[in-house]
A protein has these predicted regions:
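N-terminal nucleic-acid engagement/recognition segments and initiation subdomains in replication
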Residues: 1-138, 153, 157, 389-394, ...
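Amphipathic alpha-helical segments that form well-ordered structural scaffolds
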Residues: 142, 162-166, 193-197, 243, ...
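Residue-level preference for alpha-helix termini and adjacent loops
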Residues: 55, 59, 64, 68-71, ...
Length: 450
């Protein structure tokens, strides 16, 4: 069956060839022959056929997204996939033998690969380039409209960054992009459906990447543009989060396809996204999970569920891509967050981590402290009542992480002399110069009556 659904047979192809017979005969005449007048079984002769034959010319193309060879024309036999299959190869061998006397299968295959590479195309680029934007801004409205997310600067910037990164990845494979947008909310909200529609073509979306240490991870990514990591985000822990960070930061895979001889660097053309039903899906990490950008969805606030009118939703998303292409062409953007959004994200991520009891204990102790300088040993002994214990290195490191990332009102200093602890690195209270230092209620002053 042809791509448009019509039944095609060799008799139909025969009619085409009959109309074009002079062309086929011209090709036969132009093929190189040996001293005995027989057709040379050379790559060059095979190339001549693939480049000039009325049936084959332009029909075999290298898909730069999938890395596979696609057949984009009607070759006269029933096909169920655009990608080249073993059956297609056998049919092509038969055709070249019958019409041109070319029988060397290895040389036919080599010529087919060369011809396909010379006629390469990128389906996503071709699709994006034919889009015409109607001038209406939609990128910032996508998540509020279909998933009930907050319509604010953060949501708008994250969504715009994701779409621009996806465009960059198909035009500049392997470009640096290290952020994973994670949609967080209850089951049935349409999170995965949103990402599937965002990929435009369902074949360009995948949620099949279960493990990052799989030897076939490239094959799982091959031909996909938007890749959802749902199962991994559902079981994430302190160790796996580091693995995910490292994985999404990679810009290429080095992989050898089984039938190829040499491994090849394959720059990434995809972006990774995540979904989670759990509010505290990020493990406790006081140094920050800057590669993860959570967006909370609210199914009860949606303007229209994404599956209520699939055609309308897909068209809306397509126009958002047209808008994104205008931004991409302008060149006035970077594939990173603004400083304001980075700072906001750092604080907001805490809402998606388990509660950190140590932060509360230290913050309360500091708020009631009269001194303006502290060090990690002082906090260990006084805030946690370990007066007679010697802190271990990892315990001091944990306190440092809390002070540097989770405590407000204090700034890091390089050194200070402490009466009981000597010269130490530590922290100094940030005092508003326009206000007097506010002491705890129980602290005595020089003016208190005795």
């Amino acid at each position: 069956m042809s791509e448009n659904g019509a039944d095609v047979s060799w008799s139909d192809v025969g009619k085409v060839l009959e109309d074009e017979r002079s062309s086929v005969e011209d090709i036969q005449t132009d093929l190189a022959r040996n001293n005995k007048g027989n057709i040379c079984q050379s790559i060059d002769n095979c190339m001549t056929v693939f480049q000039r034959d009325p049936l084959l010319k332009g029909a075999i193309r290298k898909n730069e997204l999938s890395g596979k060879i696609d057949i984009v024309g009607n070759l006269g036999w029933e096909r169920t996939s655009s990608s080249l299959t073993d059956t297609d190869v056998y049919q092509l061998h038969w055709y070249l033998e019958k019409e041109y006397g070319l029988k060397n299968e290895r040389n036919i295959n080599k010529a087919m690969n060369i011809a396909a590479s010379e006629n390469r195309y990128h389906p996503i680029r071709e699709y994006l380039e034919q889009l015409v934007w109607d001038g209406k801004y939609r990128i910032g409205r996508l998540l509020p409209k279909y998933l009930g997310a907050e319509e604010d600067a953060y949501t708008r910037e994250i969504m715009q960054l994701l779409m621009l990164a996806a465009i960059h990845r198909v035009y500049e494979p392997g470009c640096k992009y290290e952020i994973m947008v994670c949609l967080v909310g209850g089951q049935g909200a349409g999170k995965s459906t949103f990402f599937r529609f965002l990929a435009i073509n369902d074949e360009w979306f995948s949620d099949d990447l279960k493990r990052m240490d799989d030897d076939n991870v490239y094959r799982k990514m091959q031909g996909h543009w938007i890749i959802e990591m749902s199962e991994m985000m559902a079981t994430v822990n302190a160790k796996s989060i580091e693995d995910i960070k490292s994985f999404i930061s990679r810009q290429k895979e080095t992989y050898k396809i089984p039938y190829e001889t040499h491994p090849e660097d394959r720059p990434r053309q995809c972006v990774f996204v995540g979904t989670s039903n759990s509010m505290d899906f990020l493990p406790l990490d006081r140094t920050g999970n800057r590669r993860f950008a959570p967006i909370l969805v609210h199914p009860d606030r949606v303007e229209k569920h994404i599956l209520e009118d699939e055609k309308e939703a897909r068209n809306y998303i397509i126009q958002a891509w047209a808008e994104a292409m205008e931004l991409y062409r302008s060149g006035q953007h970077e594939l990173k967050l603004s400083k304001d959004t980075e700072n906001y994200l750092r604080q907001m991520q805490k809402e998606f981590m388990p509660e950190d009891a140590k932060v509360g204990i230290i913050q309360l102790w500091l708020d009631e402290l009269s001194q303006d300088y502290v060090c990690s040993t002082m906090i260990y002994k006084e805030a946690f009542d370990h007066e007679y214990d010697t802190p271990k290195d990892w315990e001091l490191k944990e306190i440092n992480n809390v002070m540097n990332n989770s405590i407000s009102g204090w700034e890091k200093i390089s050194s200070h002399r402490f009466a009981e602890y000597g010269i130490q690195r530590g922290w100094r209270r940030i005092v508003d110069k326009e206000e007097f230092h506010k002491l705890p209620e129980h602290a005595e002053t020089l003016f208190d009556e005795k």
